[in-house]
Regions:
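An N-terminal assembly and electron-transfer interface module characteristic of large anaerobic redox
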Residues: 1-441
Length: 441
């Protein structure tokens, strides 16, 4: 057996076709190697906005984590953040619980105990209790909707009457399924909204858990007469969050929120339009034209598009032969980003990402422009043999790419606040420029 990391060029994948993507690049087909490069994203409850932080994005909510001790330990770092103080609580499962499932009968009493603790210590009583469970209950076949319903019914008639109880599934083993954890948690969050009279000048931006900042999208909506632009991250109270049900339409900025948007369309009669995060100014312009047409508003994006193109030109002029490696632990689709960078005139040497069939179209177009670009899968066991000195790239994008190329300038590009639209292109180009400038100093 060769001790080298398996990779395929974009041209090789193009020649094989969409229906014959190498199994080494697909998730769930082989043994999984938990590369240290991706530990931050491997667990749905780990770093960044995983299930736990996402669940607590609902204002005035707390979380009861029902799990064996080993599953809850990665919450310690999150719970140390000031904004999460007195919001995480634990119901530890014993070994008999793992076999019998008797821990489920303890949940109503555990919730009451937590609420009494908050009351007795002068803390604010929450409006929502999120129950976070792990793969253990997935294997037990636990009906968490029923468990939460019974827990909520147990509060009726008492001092905590009216508090909502909802499930959060920290099921790492369902990440490749129909409803991965981050899809389900978004559905859970917005299921709390109740029908409300519509406001023609209100819009929701859903998908992210940190507010969109310095993005032209909000400016366009404001200029079009939209008075209320709501994001869950900017709702200070539960009552303010509930007003999201009055929106005239939703703007979905993350595919993982699509199922939640469809639920809201059926249940609350709120239609939605999806704006994909891309790094092609041409595609961004097309999306804004579609938004303007659907929403019946005027959008003039010529100035912002010119600024984004200028940022690209500045980097290109300063580093005309720039070669970039792209990882998947970024605020981007690694394959779309690689294609966009190539179209900008940069070279993409390597991509570290799992190739899902829906991303084949990016690789297909990439192969026509950069056939020799190598594609590795972070989860492939042979990544153990990746030689950190083999790449001749000038800069890398993504936390995982930095692991593989530690001696090359890196732009992590995985901040909580997600870049979007032309602002995303400008900021990324500026970050790469600064990184290269610092490396040359």
């Amino acid at each position: 057996m060769k001790r080298e990391a398996i990779c395929f060029t974009a041209e090789e994948i193009l020649n094989r076709g969409k229906n014959d993507i190498p199994e080494e690049l697909l998730s769930g087909r082989n043994l999984v190697y938990s590369s240290p490069a991706t530990l931050a994203y491997n667990s749905p409850g780990a770093e960044g906005f995983g299930v736990k932080r996402a669940g607590l994005s609902v204002p005035e909510s707390i979380m009861l984590i029902v799990a064996p001790g080993c599953c809850g330990r990665n919450t310690s770092l999150i719970s140390s953040m000031p904004e999460y103080k007195n919001r995480f609580f634990y119901l530890e499962m014993s070994e008999p619980d793992l076999v019998t499932g008797r821990h489920l009968n303890k949940i109503p009493d555990a919730i009451k105990e937590v609420l009494e603790f908050l009351r007795d210590n002068g803390k604010k009583i929450p409006k929502v209790v999120m129950i976070c469970i792990t793969c253990v209950d997935a294997l037990l076949g636990t009906d968490m909707d029923r468990v939460c319903r019974k827990a909520e019914e147990a509060l009726i008639g008492g001092e905590f009457d009216g508090i909502k109880v909802r499930p959060c599934y920290m099921y790492a083993l369902t990440r490749e399924g129909r409803r991965p954890p981050m899809v389900h948690v978004r559905q859970t969050i917005y299921s709390l909204l109740e029908p409300m009279e519509k406001d023609a000048r209100s819009v929701n931006i859903i998908g992210g858990f940190a507010p969109l900042e310095n993005t032209e999208l909000k400016e366009y909506l404001t200029l079009a007469g939209i008075r209320n632009i709501r994001q869950i991250s900017t709702c200070g109270t539960y009552e303010e969050f509930l007003k999201m049900a009055s929106a005239n339409f939703n703007i979905v900025i993350d595919p993982e929120a699509r199922a939640a948007a469809e639920d809201m369309n059926k249940r609350l009669n709120i239609p939605y339009i999806e704006l994909t995060r891309v790094y092609s100014s041409g595609k961004i312009s097309s999306q804004y034209k579609a938004l303007a047409s659907v929403a019946g508003i005027d959008i003039d994006d010529s100035a912002e598009k010119a600024e984004a193109d200028e940022a690209v030109a500045r980097l290109k002029n300063a580093y005309p032969d720039l070669k970039i490696n792209v990882g998947e632990c970024t605020n981007a689709n690694a394959f779309e980003l690689a294609l966009s960078l190539t179209r900008m005139g940069f070279k993409v040497g390597e991509i570290y990402a799992t190739l899902a069939p829906e991303n084949y179209v990016y690789v297909k177009n990439l192969a026509l422009l950069s056939p020799d670009t190598k594609i590795y899968c972070n989860m492939e066991p042979t990544m153990l043999y990746y030689k950190i000195s083999q790449s001749d790239a000038n800069v890398t994008i993504g936390k995982d790419a930095k692991f593989y190329c530690p001696y090359i300038p890196n732009v992590a590009w995985n901040q909580d606040t997600r870049p979007f639209g032309y602002q995303g292109i400008r900021d990324l180009m500026d970050k790469i420029f600064e990184s290269m400038k610092e490396a040359k100093a």
